[in-house]
Amino acid sequence: MWPKSTAADDPGWTHWKYHNFQPFQTFKFANIPRGNTIQEMIANTQRYQAELVAMAAESYRRQRYQPVTALFHFMFVETWPSINWGVVDYLRKPKAGYYALQKAYQPILPSIEPVTAVWRQGSEATVRLWAINDTWSACEACRLKWQVKQNGRVLAKGNTSLTLPPDSGSRIKDITVTPTTRHNVTIEYEISDRAGNTVGSNQRNERVESPPEQ
């Protein structure tokens, strides 16, 4: 059941391939680590899918009317015991990608755009904050609050108040920080209405690489 290697021609993958698993695309193209157990591989592949689903869905949301006019997720449910792109398996059990899609599809979305592709210790990196209101009602005097943290240390934080018009999307702020260690950086961003109720929340984690060799 557990193949000896990640090689696509390893006969151990034959049964997996029957169920649509693609070892070459998974391990060589997407560069997803297999892990030491099936459970670790499931966690690694689901994490990759969740990150990709969130990145794509949020990107399309930010491109509203420029040129995106509608958004449909493919694919949602597996129709048989398939190792594929569905975010819900054939037993109707949600994968990590389902919850990523749920967050990216919030009607009022505090979107986090990754500007810097690779974060490195000691180098500046940037994310861009957006506020998207895909409802037919204005969010009057909404409060936007954000925070960037690394290993318990706050690298940046801030807040602002503004009205989000109905059917709108706005670029709010670019945030540039310098990670000081190899620990992951977490960006937290939320939108509250004037009564203090959270109407949208989001979080993004950035892995930090070593400084480039001199």
Summary of predicted features, one role per range:
Residues I132, K149, T176-T178, S192:
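Solvent-exposed residues in well-ordered beta-strands and their adjoining turns
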Residues H183-R194:
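Short, aromatic- and glycine-rich surface loops/edge beta-strands on solvent-exposed regions
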Residues A96, K157, V199-Q203:
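Short edge beta-strand segments in beta-sheet-rich domains
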Residues Q25, L101, P110, R171-I172, ...:
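Generic hydrophobic, helix-prone segments enriched in Leu/Val/Ile
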Residues M1-A141, V148, A156, L164:
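Substrate-binding clefts and catalytic carboxylate motifs of secreted carbohydrate-active enzymes
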Residues N197-Q214:
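Short beta-strand elements
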Residues C142-R143, R153-R182:
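Intrinsically disordered, low-complexity Pro/Gly/Ser/Thr-rich segments with frequent PxxP/GP/PP motifs
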